[in-house]
């Protein structure tokens, strides 16, 4: 770690710490936070010329206390906050108590609500936070530089959100996100453009899946896939011949397709698991239409569903939005969407779940009272997650392992308000470990009632669900 000062115009920024295990781009992000000069405009003189984003610090000969010179024009569009974050431990005890319960909001840096809402949903996953906290700052050769930088920036952002009681300006994270995915740096008339939250969500999970699956303190070599990934068993049938084939596909989310027939999430999921595609037929020797039917073959700890609300409208040359109301539950059972093999694995945990719930209701559970495929009545989803964040049912037995039941509890909703994906506003609604719901509208946070969360189902110009995340209901066997 080195400490330097930087002279820019008439200002001198004293005692800036440089983490030499991080690339110079991170240092430039620090300077952006202080000066408002974007990294791409920064010209910093070092030994051998200008400081490059991926330079090796050990070759630059920097010394503690050295003064560096920076040139560049500040960005007037987005300015760093004048005051830094206020941390919980710096507040009086009475204020600390008043602010406990949920993390801080995120400052909108200029059409960054898509990013803010995505990160507020992801930070609600304690297992992901644990994996990130164990991630090392020193990059391994198996991770590319920008993926490593984004993973470290995510770790630091989550840490700051947990400590701060005032809204955090995610400037360093945002700069690294744009470095990794330049589409998020697009400008229109000098302003940053609104982006698609689903694209941000998908890119974040992909990046973290690449960096966190490598050798680390984690017991799971592919932690992100274990948390969010599911396997689909795809069966293909050619409509013009008797050809049939099957393949396995790994995905991080399911799609809820919306049509005039779809009124509920479950119906949309069924539509999303069926479709048509064109591919070469070996027997016909030409391209033919195949019917594709998918079944879920493995379940994730956290199930993500995207409502396919946006489509390309040629007349206006932009993404238009389907406003149709599609209801979704606090509690989702996807047993009937699973493959035959997976259903067999779920039968015993589901039966034990029925027995436990029957005992709670003062009833004598019996296997004869319901068939294997019947819907399972569950306790109120508001109280289904224990305080550690583990969605589970039944007493934890020593040595017992948790098993999937195919039943999930809603833990976060990402909504969009507006008529186009390229405009409008994104907001996150996140269930806390206490069972309470909090709305994260950029820097503003507010408590919400659980019954109001399922009203974000669309049908007008109000906030409507675009991405929902459910947590698995587990049972010890």
UniProtKB/Swiss-Prot annotation:
Key word Protease present: yes
Xref: Pfam families: ubiquitin, UCH
GO biological process: negative regulation of ERAD pathway; proteasome-mediated ubiquitin-dependent protein catabolic process; protein deubiquitination
Reactions catalysed according to its record: Thiol-dependent hydrolysis of ester, thioester, amide, peptide and isopeptide bonds formed by the C-terminal Gly of ubiquitin (a 76-residue protein attached to proteins as an intracellular targeting signal)
Gene Ontology MF, one: proteasome binding
Domain called Ubiquitin-like: residue spans: 2-77
Annotated spans, Disordered: 364-401
Active site: 113, 425
Top-level class of the enzyme under EC nomenclature: hydrolase
Assembly description: Interacts with calmodulin (CaM).
Functional description taken from the UniProt entry: Recognizes and hydrolyzes the peptide bond at the C-terminal Gly of ubiquitin. Involved in the processing of poly-ubiquitin precursors as well as that of ubiquitinated proteins.
Name under which the protein is recorded: Ubiquitin carboxyl-terminal hydrolase 7
Organism field: Arabidopsis thaliana (Mouse-ear cress)
């Amino acid at each position: 770690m080195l400490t330097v000062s930087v002279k820019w115009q008439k200002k001198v920024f004293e005692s800036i710490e440089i983490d030499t295990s991080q690339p110079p781009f991170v240092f430039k992000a620090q300077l952006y936070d202080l000066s408002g000069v974007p990294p791409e405009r920064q010209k910093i003189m070092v030994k051998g010329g200008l400081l490059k984003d991926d330079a090796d610090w050990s070759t630059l000969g920097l010394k503690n206390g050295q003064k560096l010179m920076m040139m560049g024009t500040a960005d007037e569009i987005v300015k760093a906050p004048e005051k830094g974050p206020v941390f919980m431990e710096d507040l009086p005890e009475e204020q600390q108590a008043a602010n406990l319960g949920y993390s801080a909001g995120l400052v909108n840096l200029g059409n960054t609500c898509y990013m803010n809402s995505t990160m507020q949903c992801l930070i609600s996953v304690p297992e992901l936070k644990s994996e990130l906290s164990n991630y090392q700052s020193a990059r391994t050769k198996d991770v590319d530089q920008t993926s490593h930088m984004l993973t470290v920036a995510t770790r630091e952002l989550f840490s700051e959100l947990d400590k701060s009681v005032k809204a955090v300006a995610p400037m360093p994270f945002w700069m690294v996100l744009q470095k990794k995915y330049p589409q998020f740096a697009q400008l229109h008339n000098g302003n940053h453009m609104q982006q698609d939250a689903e694209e941000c969500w998908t890119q974040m999970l992909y990046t973290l899946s690449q960096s966190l699956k490598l050798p680390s303190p984690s017991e799971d070599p592919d932690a992100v896939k274990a948390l969010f990934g599911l396997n689909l068993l795809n069966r293909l049938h050619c409509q013009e011949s008797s050809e049939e084939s099957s393949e396995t596909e790994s995905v991080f989310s399911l799609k809820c397709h919306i049509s005039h027939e779809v009124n509920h999430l479950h119906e949309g999921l069924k539509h999303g698991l069926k479709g048509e595609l064109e591919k070469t037929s070996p027997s016909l020797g030409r391209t033919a239409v195949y019917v594709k039917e998918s079944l879920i073959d493995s379940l994730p700890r956290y199930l993500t569903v995207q409502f396919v609300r946006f489509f390309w409208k040629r007349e206006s040359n932009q993404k238009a939005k389907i406003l149709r109301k599609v209801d979704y539950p606090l509690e989702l059972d996807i047993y009937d969407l699973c493959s035959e093999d997976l259903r067999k694995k779920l039968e015993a945990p589901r039966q034990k779940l029925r027995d436990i719930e029957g005992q709670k209701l003062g009833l004598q559970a019996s296997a004869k009272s319901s068939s294997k495929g019947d819907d399972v009545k569950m306790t109120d989803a508001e109280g289904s997650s224990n305080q550690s964040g583990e969605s589970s049912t039944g007493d934890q037995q020593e040595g017992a392992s948790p098993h999937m039941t195919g039943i999930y509890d809603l833990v976060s909703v990402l909504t969009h308000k507006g008529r186009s994906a390229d405009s409008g506003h994104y907001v996150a609604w996140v269930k806390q470990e206490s069972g309470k719901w909090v709305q994260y509208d950029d820097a503003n946070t507010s408590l919400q009632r659980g019954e109001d969360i399922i009203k974000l189902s669309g049908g007008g110009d109000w906030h409507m669900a675009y991405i929902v995340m459910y947590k698995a209901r587990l049972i010890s066997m």
